[in-house]
Amino acid sequence: MSRSYNDELQFLEKINKNCWRIKKGFVPNMQVEGVFYVNDALEKLMFEELRNACRGGGVGGFLPAMKQIGNVAALPGIVHRSIGLPDVHSGYGFAIGNMAAFDMNDPEAVVSPGGVGFDINCGVRLLRTNLDESDVQPVKEQLAQAMFDHIPVGVGSKGVIPMNAKDLEEALEMGVDWSLREGYAWAEDKEHCEEYGRMLQADPNKVSARAKKRGLPQLGTLGAGNHYAEIQVVDEIFNEYAAKKMGIDHKGQVCVMIHSGSRGLGHQVATDALVAMEKAMKRDKIIVNDRQLACARIASPEGQDYLKGMAAAGNYAWVNRSSMTFLTRQAFAKVFNTTPDDLDLHVIYDVSHNIAKVEQHVVDGKERTLLVHRKGSTRAFPPHHPLIAVDYQLTGQPVLIGGTMGTCSYVLTGTEQGMTETFGTTCHGAGRALSRAKSRRNLDFQDVLDKLADMGIAIRVASPKLVMEEAPESYKNVTDVVNTCHDAGISKKAIKLRPIAVIKG
């Protein structure tokens, strides 16, 4: 029996201007409450989605995000609450922008591939340069072309970094350490990666032959979808101290943002795990509200296999971003006829947006070991946290928020409040407002390209027809999303960047 929209509203309560509570009973079997962070504009989108669903209009086969946050709150072993960040939108199982933590000491607690997503360790890396916008403007087209030539892009693109099966095994196990050994990374790059670019529990044997076959040719490639490399300039500095620690000292300074993940390999790891977990759920009699929330007990063989395979896919993504960093450094060096070192092409930070990790958090006054699922959300640890690099001990961890093609991006820093409210987690980007199919129907790709050109943005796209799926109109406003997190206190704004060139799959 489905409830009317007004009945649904009985279960929703506004805590403050940026946060709503989802009370138990909104969906069956909720173990904990849900919350979601919004501002006025984003709130309207969330409630419209719920209203449409009550009228029987689905969200491209997914439940509305609010329902998905509720269903995650019903998973065995969840602690504290199920959290929706301001860029939350419907996804497979978990909404994208939904995070949740599970108690590692609870034998019933689960791990769910839908809580990580298909593009395991999809993430963002930001490089700085000592160039100014005035240095780059005259050679902008040339630079965009050089990056497009150096970095393989598009759906079926193949990597240029030589890889054989043995290399792949080692890369899956070693992450950035592999790139370092092979000469594709600088030693300091590693310090500025989440997890130092290597998840230690990775086991290449838990990655299927099919996944490896998909992953081998794609290493060091950009892929399609929402993946891109952007040449950006610093548009605004909100926190000068934090910016200086990141090597950013003036407006107009040029940066490069790389947004990519584990390509076909991560997708296959997730698919394989979902099949295995369907069986494990029957065996262990695990009940979930939504079939897409297939999961397994953390301690079960299926749970452990997935975590080891997921870590290997995570390492693959870090190697991938390292390879693209290497190619970006080459492209810049070529155009400016100097060395990457002389251009100060250092990694500011590299964050993951889709990952599950074992972390220590204080819940109800007690320190607990939790498996934190972050899907379409970003780790945002506060100052003095032992897991962040020495350079950022006083500022808090840098958090990289990619906007959409042709809109601004942000660098945020983690806060103590975020640590207590959201397990040290904040938003990850703009969050879709229109489905991919709707975007293709509503927008014409030439209009999108022309609009970017009018904004003075150089663009190189491998598949122009995919451009409208990623047009700014298809997304929520990234500034709304970032400001909501800032006002809620779960992360603070440090730097705003705007694009001058986009390279895209």
From Swiss-Prot:
Residues annotated as catalytic: 428 (gmp-histidine intermediate)
Reactions this protein catalyses: a 3'-end 3'-phospho-ribonucleotide-RNA + a 5'-end dephospho-ribonucleoside-RNA + GTP = a ribonucleotidyl-ribonucleotide-RNA + GMP + diphosphate; a 3'-end 2',3'-cyclophospho-ribonucleotide-RNA + a 5'-end dephospho-ribonucleoside-RNA + GTP + H2O = a ribonucleotidyl-ribonucleotide-RNA + GMP + diphosphate + H(+)
Major site of localization recorded for this protein: nucleus
One GO BP: placenta development
Localization per record: Nucleus; Cytoplasm
Gene3D superfamilies: tRNA-splicing ligase RtcB (3.90.1860.10)
Cofactor note (record): Binds 2 manganese ions per subunit.
Cofactor field: Mn(2+)
Gene Ontology cellular-component terms listed: cytoplasm; cytosol; endoplasmic reticulum membrane; intracellular membrane-bounded organelle; nuclear envelope; nucleoplasm; nucleus; tRNA-splicing ligase complex
Binding site for Mn(2+) 1: 119, 122, 227
Presence of keyword ATP-binding: no
Keyword set, alphabetical order: Cytoplasm, GTP-binding, Isopeptide bond, Ligase, Manganese, Metal-binding, Nucleotide-binding, Nucleus, Phosphoprotein, tRNA processing, Ubl conjugation
Class in the EC hierarchy, top level: ligase
UniProt entry tagged with the keyword Transmembrane: no
Cross-linked sites for Glycyl lysine isopeptide (Lys-Gly) (interchain with G-Cter in SUMO2): 496
Positions that bind GMP: 226-230, 353-354, 402-405, 409, 428-431, 504
Activity regulation (UniProt): Protein archease stimulates the activity of the tRNA ligase complex with high efficiency in the presence of GTP.
PANTHER family, alphabetized: RNA-SPLICING LIGASE RTCB HOMOLOG (PTHR11118:SF1)
Function: Catalytic subunit of the tRNA-splicing ligase complex that acts by directly joining spliced tRNA halves to mature-sized tRNAs by incorporating the precursor-derived splice junction phosphate into the mature tRNA as a canonical 3',5'-phosphodiester. May act as an RNA ligase with broad substrate specificity, and may function toward other RNAs.
Family of this protein: Belongs to the RtcB family.
Other remarks on this protein: Ligation probably proceeds through 3 nucleotidyl transfer steps, with 2',3'-cyclic phosphate termini being hydrolyzed to 3'-P termini in a step that precedes 3'-P activation with GMP. In the first nucleotidyl transfer step, RTCB reacts with GTP to form a covalent RTCB-histidine-GMP intermediate with release of PPi; in the second step, the GMP moiety is transferred to the RNA 3'-P; in the third step, the 5'-OH from the opposite RNA strand attacks the activated 3'-P to form a 3',5'-phosphodiester bond and release GMP.
Protein name as catalogued: RNA-splicing ligase RtcB homolog
Organism field: Homo sapiens (Human)
